[in-house]
Every structure is written in structure tokens, then in C-alpha cells.
Amino acid sequence: MGKYFGTDGVRGEANVELTPELAFKLGRFGGYVLSQHETERPRVFVARDTRISGEMLEAALIAGLLSVGIEVYKLGVLATPGVSYLVRTEKASAGVMISASHNPALDNGIKFFGSDGFKLADEQELEIEALLDAKEDLLPRPSAEGLGALVDYPEGLRKYERFLVTTGADLDGLKIALDTANGAASVSARNVFLDLNADITVIGENPNGLNINDGIGSTHPEKLQDLVTETASDIGLAFDGDSDRLIAVDENGAIVDGDKIMFIIGKYLSEKGLLAKNTIVTTVMSNLGFHKALDSCGIHKKVTAVGDRYVVEEMRQFGYNLGGEQSGHVIIMDYNTTGDGQLTAVQLTKIMKETGKTLSELASEVTIYPQKLVNIRVDNSMKERAMEVPAIAEVIAQMEGEMAGNGRILVRPSGTEPLLRVMAEAPSNEEVDYYVDTIAAVVRAEIGLD
């Protein structure tokens, strides 16, 4: 990670850390870096989620892009993967999404996509950071006809919706509960599933700028679980603020997380001979039960660091077409170049329809090991160096010794927040509590801020 860019773009508290001034510079410098080799006038697509700070940052970012002669297509509220899709299919120079994904409304973020629809390489981010830190802005300042023009492009949303529908199946007879997190999916998910002939009920569809992800969406699926059982729905689908992830709920109200979703889609593709190299790419956070289920089906796996960008890098480098995270980021490379919650939802419901199986039946092959994750607030300067603290390293080694191979421990820094995450898996909840609580107590004593 760089000084400004984390694992998912630039993030911070809106108007405090991520200011309009910084957004202007990101537009100006980011736009320049991504379009400096264009032979024609560059075009950049810009979208946002529903946060109250979105329009403020959008205006500043667009001003920066226009100031270096870039033509800006303003998409309005749209899911992050919609930007990625449109950049590729409309042959734009780049795309920019203004969102902090699953974070609360006070935060916001800015992430860039290259002309290929993928997030930026580290080298490009470092080039932008060098311009941000330069003592003087020496980039061109065109005037008159050299300035960029702003184009409102609401039809981008409709094109993305039509794309999603073309990948699905007729869902007539399927009852679906949707939770759009008062976020970007609130403008599209209803339309997509109605076009697929599903019988739908929707919550989290009334954004006011402040209620995005607020007790709702993929990080808070409790309301959706209640809705599924109350309406006797066949499946519940919960998206996060920018709709790049999906958490599902089965007909009994039980959570079906990213691991189980990847298994269901992966097994379906494998049985049809469509899973590239018969392999799924996942991260170190995936549950042991997921790995065991893949082994039982003869499906291979590749494991990366946490973060969908690392999953995508592995997929691109070795030609895999399915990967993702337990948190619900699922990348289906045959269709899109980034995690896409609505696309994943369309594929999951298509599999239910084609197989005639309930979601609980499809997910039953994955027996999840009890897992506990604790987030401990630490100084940003310490979260990357926690393992250098002798007491922390010692307690982790002690707990791993007690596990004797029947479980695992993962201690890692958050890529976007000042947190150290302590996770353990073991055969019983009691064992998990013991391992996590013991390690967390030492971390708090040594470097915790609470």
C-alpha cells in the first residue's frame, strides 16, 4: 500500500481526510496518468454510491478531470462493477468510483479503473502519489477548446442492468427478498430481478445519504433473515453500499456467505467443464470447511492475501475464471473484471432454477468450522508491525501449538481501517473463543488503543 492508496483506492472520513481538495487533485493527477498515452481525447466514466458526501466529491473530482482536458461521462449512482463493465464495453480511457463500499456514511473513497476494467496496478498508483506529493503542479492547464466536457450519461445504468439480465435465467416461480443496503444497488437490483420474472420483496431501497449500510446490507443481514422467513422467500440477497459483494440467506433464514457462494458456483461450473483449470482462487480468510468441501469435489484452490485485488491478480496471471472472498466479493471473470454482487446474485439464482435445488441443499456440502473474528483498534503505524512485538508472536505460536493442526489462526492488519484483525477456526465454539480471546488480550495490552 502507498501513502494515499490502500487495498481499495483512497479512503477516509469525507470532508476531513478525503476532502474536495484531495478529490480535485486525484481527478487531475489520476486522469493525467491514465490518459497520457491516448491519441484521441480521453473519456473517463465517473459514478458514485448514495452517500451524502458523494456529490461534493464527485463535483471536485470531475473538475480535476476536466482541467486536464478529459471528457467526463457522469453516470450518477451506479454499482462499482457497473463502472468496470462500462469502461470495458464502451472503450473508455478509465473509470472512477466514489464509494467507501461497506463502510459507514461518514467515510468515502475514490477508486480508479483502467481501460481494461481492472483496478490500477501498484505502479500506476505510485505514479499518482508522486504527483500528489510534488511541490508544484506542473501538469498542462489547457484553456478553451483544450478543456474537457461533461456529459450526463444515465443510459449507462440501463446498459449495466441489461447486461446483468442477459447472464441470468427466467426466475418465474422463485420468491426473492432483496436488501440493497440503501446503497448503489437500490437503483438497479429491483429492475434486474423483475426483468428476470422473479417475485420480489425489497428493503434498504430508500437512501437518504446517511443510511447507507446502517444496520442493513451484507454486513448486517439480520433484517433480511427476518424478511426471508416472514415472506417465505426462497432466497435472500444482501448487497453492500457499492454492490461489489453479496451475502445470501437460505429459505430457512440461515446465512450463506462468500465461501459457500463460491463453492456453489464453482461446483456448478466444474460439473459443466467451465471452471478454468478446475480451480477457485480464494484468500487466507476462507473457512477450513470450504477447503474440505472443495477437496471432496476434486476442485483445486489457490490462496492469496486478503483483498479482492489480490484474488484478481492471481486470476489474471494464471487464467482462472472464479475467485473471491468469504466476505462476499465474488469475481466471475467470464462476465466482469471485479467483484459484482448483483451478477453473483443472478448466477446463484440461475443455479437454483436450473438444478431445482433449494439454497440450503446447494450449500449443505460445506460444513463451516466455528470461526471468530475480533477487530482491535490500533495505531496505523503499528498494524503492519504487530508480529514484530515479541509478546504477540509468542502467544500466537503458543495457541497454534495447542491446536495441533486441527484449526488455524490468522492475525492481519485491515487494508482500509486502523484495525488489527484476530481470527481463529477450531472444531468448537469454546475452543475458538479461547484462542481468539487469549490472543486479543495480549494485542490490546501491547498495542491496543481501546
UniProtKB/Swiss-Prot annotation:
Activated by phosphorylation. GO terms for biological process: carbohydrate metabolic process; peptidoglycan biosynthetic process; UDP-N-acetylglucosamine biosynthetic process. Its EC number is 5.4.2.10. One of its GO terms (cellular component) is cytosol. Its cofactor is Mg(2+). PROSITE patterns: PGM_PMM. This is Phosphoglucosamine mutase. It comes from Streptococcus equi subsp. zooepidemicus (strain MGCS10565). The gene is glmM.
